[in-house]
Amino acid sequence: MIDVSMLALAGSLILAAQGAIAAEPAFVRTDRFIDLPSDERLFVREVRGRNTPPAAEQSAVLLVHGARVPGIASFDLPVPGGSLAVDLAAAGHVVYVLDLRGYGASSRPAAMDEDPSGSAPLIRTDDAVADIAAAVDAIRGWSGNNPISIVGWATGGHWAGAFAARYPEAVARLVLYNTLYDGTAEHETLGRGSPLEDPLRPGSFNASAFGGYRFNTRDSLFSAWNNSIPIADKNLWRDERVARAYGDAALVSDASSTSREPPSFRSPSGALADSFEVITGKTQWSASALVMPVLVIRSEKDFWSRPQDAEALAKEAPEAELVTIPDATHFVHLDRDDAGRAVFLSALTRFLDPSQSRPK
């Protein structure tokens, strides 16, 4: 277990240094597309320091978003404190932000242009693993790095874990951040007895209710976040500029969002089906196959993962460490520094630094 008080101090120093750096246009963003054999394509944004040495001399880090909000809205908001990609680029990494198929600027299945009820849940674990594999192959060519490190948030951690378990040789270091695992069968909002369970087929995902994809309004992004912030004035915990940019970027990620009232962006339902299966005992991968260094980060007030998930991941992965951030929310990387973000960033940058030995 890591001493979070020391991480908080280190994180404050990192953020102070980055504040000075960020006063200049110090980062370069390059948007790329990966063509797939299926005639679909994946969107990837590269973020690096303007004065970063040649890519082969740096460590490459891939960021994988979760179930609803795509990569840019999750990891590269254009406001202070809103870009994990910039945080990691400031630490010397070359960072890649991926949109899986069905999300953001990547290709969407044709079924997402039809009524959601007309298809089964779209973009399941195998689809996500294939997309991550394509991104990793492309990043190897762009960066000269092999293997690369991966950071997955929530369902992104589930998908990244599935990829790393299947292709361990491709992953240098793996970060599983607020990620579900089969730590316990109890989950009020995602498990048995929740809206995700089919009332006519107990133990099965309610595919008829969720269909192939779902619509998400701006307001829907903040209910769970607000409920987990332990103070009345949410702006004291979460910068209002970050919250506004998060909602804006999520809606802009879908060109059809303004065709509905209120505006809403589409996200595939496969992540929900995967999550229900994991919670109800249909394990899709084993942490014992994660032979690379693994960092498990869990926010104490996370509504998605359970303490048992983090503990099971850290216990089963052969070379894992666990950081629990007190009072932090599911969105800690988008909260204020003193609301856990500094601790999160310190733990992450320390772990991803290839020059540092990992604490025992």
Task: Indicate residue ranges for each PLM-predicted region.
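N-terminal cap/lid segment of alpha/beta-hydrolase-fold proteins
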Residues: 23-54
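Conserved acidic catalytic loop of the alpha/beta-hydrolase fold
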Residues: 127-147
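Conserved hydrolase catalytic core segment
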Residues: 146-151, 155-185
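Conserved alpha/beta-hydrolase "acid-adjacent" motif
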Residues: 303-309
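Conserved strand-to-loop "acid loop" that flanks and positions the catalytic carboxylate
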Residues: 294-301
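Alpha/beta-hydrolase
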Residues: 185, 189-292
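Short, surface-exposed "cap/lid" segments of acyl-processing enzymes
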Residues: 53-97
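Catalytic histidine-centered segment of alpha/beta-hydrolase-like enzymes
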Residues: 328-342
